[in-house]
Amino acid sequence: MQRIMLRAKIHRAKVTQADLHYEGSCGIDADLLEAADIKVGEKIELYNINNGERFSTYAIQGARGSGEISLNGAAARCAHLGDLMIICTYGPMTDEEIATYTPKIVFVDEDNHFAGMKK
C-alpha cells in the first residue's frame, strides 16, 4: 500500500508578486526550489497563513536569490502582497519508504532567502 506523504515544505514565505493576467503558476526563487527539491512544473499546495485560503498550482522558477514568491493567474486572487504562505509538495510512499524518509522543511528569512532546514 502507498500513502500520500509530505515530501517538502517551504515555511512562511512572503508573497512578493501577484499577476492575475499571467497564465498561472507560482514563481519561486530558484534557491528555494533547489533546497526543497521542488521541480519546475511540479504540483504544489499553498496555504495562506493570513486568511486560511488553501489552493494548488504548479511551480515555476523565479530568479535565483530574488526571494520571489509570485502568484499568477487565478492564484493571484488567493493572497495579497506580503501574505505568509506555506508551500508543500506530497508524494506516494510505501510503509518501508516512510520508515526512513524525512521531508525537506525549508525556512526563509524576512526577505524569502534560504535560512536553513529543519533538522
UniProtKB/Swiss-Prot annotation:
Q: What does this protein do?
A: Catalyzes the pyruvoyl-dependent decarboxylation of aspartate to produce beta-alanine.
Instruction: Give the main location.
Output: cytoplasm
Which major enzyme category is it? lyase
- The UniProt gene name for this protein comes to panD
Upper classification of the source organism reads:
Bacteria, Pseudomonadati, Pseudomonadota, Betaproteobacteria, Burkholderiales
Q: Give the E.C. number(s).
A: 4.1.1.11
Question: So what does this thing catalyse?
Answer: L-aspartate + H(+) = beta-alanine + CO2
The family classification in the record reads: Belongs to the PanD family.
Could you tell me which pathway this protein works in? Cofactor biosynthesis; (R)-pantothenate biosynthesis; beta-alanine from L-aspartate: step 1/1
Q: What is this protein called?
A: Aspartate 1-decarboxylase
**Coiled-coil positions:** none
What is the required cofactor set for this protein? pyruvate
